[in-house]
Amino acid sequence: MTEAEQKAAFLGGLVVSFKEQMHTDVLVKPGEEAPPIPTHKAVLAARSKVFRNMLDSDECKTSPEESITLPDLSHDELKSLLEFLYSGNLKAPYNQYRSLYLAADKYDISYLQDVCRNHFIASLSSRNVLDILELASIPCDTILKDAAINHIVKHMEEVVVPMKYETFVQRNPDLSVEITRAYLRETKAKAKDHGAPLNGNTRPRIW
């Protein structure tokens, strides 16, 4: 067994303690009517300052079963989040990434947010880029937002022609302005590179 394999096996014991509920001391409840998930205070507190504050609150201390509730997450999403806290690996299905990304922002789990962000950036397409741009604006994630806008600028016709874009514009006028400005900057830069600066007779196409 290599050193890397030994290390993985050693750290895997923490995941086993979660899955087998070894000496758990707090219940984490999802937002829906579903069973709570037993876990360990030490892991929650170590991974998130927000969780640490929740566990230190009088409400949690006086609860007969010592529990905290994460109302934003379903039972399956909560399980994926907790498994990530123990393992550092995200094995959740794609349809959970949005909720986990927002939960990572809300509960200050920066590594989970980074993992979700990288996944979104890697999966950007003309079909999902508007949804991802809207998502990035919720926690004001400039990295994800810039990546989405850059993708839109490079694939402008594919993104803005479908009817979906009209709905997006109505719902997000400020983001639409940012897209237009980014497209203008890109068009001017390309014109300059080709020695044809924009003038009154040469205008970029704006949808």
Swiss-Prot record:
Q: Which UniProt keywords apply?
A: Ubl conjugation pathway
Q: Which Pfam families match?
A: BTB
**One example of a Gene Ontology biological process annotation:** protein ubiquitination
Q: Domain (BTB): give its ranges.
A: 24-94
Give the metabolic or biological pathway: Protein modification; protein ubiquitination
The record ties this protein, via InterPro entries, to: At1g01640-like, BTB/POZ_dom, SKP1/BTB/POZ_sf
Q: Which PROSITE patterns match?
A: BTB (PS50097)
Q: What is known of its domains?
A: The BTB/POZ-like domain may mediate the interaction with some component of ubiquitin ligase complexes.
Assembly notes:
Interacts with CUL3A.
Q: What does this protein do?
A: May act as a substrate-specific adapter of an E3 ubiquitin-protein ligase complex (CUL3-RBX1-BTB) which mediates the ubiquitination and subsequent proteasomal degradation of target proteins.
Question: Would you tell me the protein name for this molecule?
Answer: BTB/POZ domain-containing protein At1g01640
Q: Which organism is it from?
A: Arabidopsis thaliana (Mouse-ear cress)
